[in-house]
């Protein structure tokens, strides 16, 4: 009977450690989800700023007049 009791206690100990590990992993997932949400918000802000930028007054290479030949 002692062997069965030891096995039960060992299983209970393992279960307690697994529950702790699951909780720690859950907290990490929550942190990562918050980080992802923050980064997505930052990306949306950057997209908005890029779209709001006015075009440059500098001519592109295609629009530039070719230099005179010597």
UniProtKB/Swiss-Prot annotation:
UniProt-listed InterPro entries: SlyX
Gene3D superfamilies noted in UniProt: 1.20.5.300
Family affiliation: Belongs to the SlyX family.
PANTHER family cross-referenced by the UniProt entry: PROTEIN SLYX
The name this protein goes by in its record: Protein SlyX homolog
Lineage per the UniProt record: Bacteria, Pseudomonadati, Pseudomonadota, Gammaproteobacteria, Alteromonadales
């Amino acid at each position: 009977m002692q062997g069965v009791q030891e096995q039960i206690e060992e299983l209970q100990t393992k279960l307690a450690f697994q529950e702790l590990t699951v909780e720690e992993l859950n907290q990490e997932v929550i942190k990562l989800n918050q980080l992802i949400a923050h980064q997505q918000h930052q990306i949306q802000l950057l997209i908005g700023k890029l779209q709001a930028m006015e075009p440059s007054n500098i001519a592109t290479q295609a629009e530039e007049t070719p230099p005179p030949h010597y």
